[in-house]
Amino acid sequence: QLMDLGFLNRDLERARGIDYNLTFRDTIDIGVPVDLQISIAANRNLERSLTFTNPDGTVDYESYEGEWGFSEWRAQSGVVLAWDKWRFNWQTRYLGAVTQDEDAIDAFSDAFTASDTCLGPPTDELCRDYAEAGSYMIHSVSISYEEDNWYLGMGVRNLEDKSPPLADPSEITGVKSRAIGYGYDLMGRNF
């Protein structure tokens, strides 16, 4: 018997968006000359999709924009102030809101049927497997002093100690109800 499986082809994977990059540099005078640099890098996700043709010819189209890992907006910005041997740095990271794949949203139910997040009544919206997150922003700051042969620096990453969003790990990639692998800070504030 002849086996003819052919080559598995994803057909078309598409990523389309707009990148925005802005850098501003100047020296400002506040009694002493201070070098100022402001930079912003942002990305707007317009399309992230996959078109797949099964061996029987059935075409399956999946759109990912706005879902986990493919938020509509991502951005990073920084402000640097430098004077003499001192340097101050403030960075911000932003991830836009995300939602679960519409096809994977479970019907409302209790923990004894399809939901594994609580024991409420079947119509309780808090019992649905949860896989949505609002926008997320963290700030980090540092200050440093540099001499010819030594350097001293200190900083705080995730200044506000912002946790990643809660989500059901049976719906998205996560551990202990925390989304992992999507750009969220998992370490919390550290110095």
For the regions a protein language model found, what residue spans apply to each?
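Gram-negative outer-membrane beta-barrel transporters
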Residues: 1-104
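Solvent-exposed loop segments that connect transmembrane elements
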Residues: 1-3, 50-64, 100-129, 166-183
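Outer-membrane beta-barrel proteins
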Residues: 8-12, 66, 130-133, 182-184
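Residues that define the transmembrane beta-barrel architecture of outer-membrane proteins
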Residues: 14-18, 71-75, 135-139, 148, ...
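Hydrophobic, well-ordered secondary-structure elements that form the walls
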Residues: 20-22, 79, 90, 139-143, ...
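A generic structural signal for ordered secondary structure
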Residues: 42-44, 83-86, 139-141, 150-155
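C-terminal beta-signal and adjacent terminal beta-strands/loops
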Residues: 46, 93-109, 144-191
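Short, glycine/charged-rich beta-strand-loop motifs at protein surfaces that mediate ligand recognition
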Residues: 126-132, 139-141
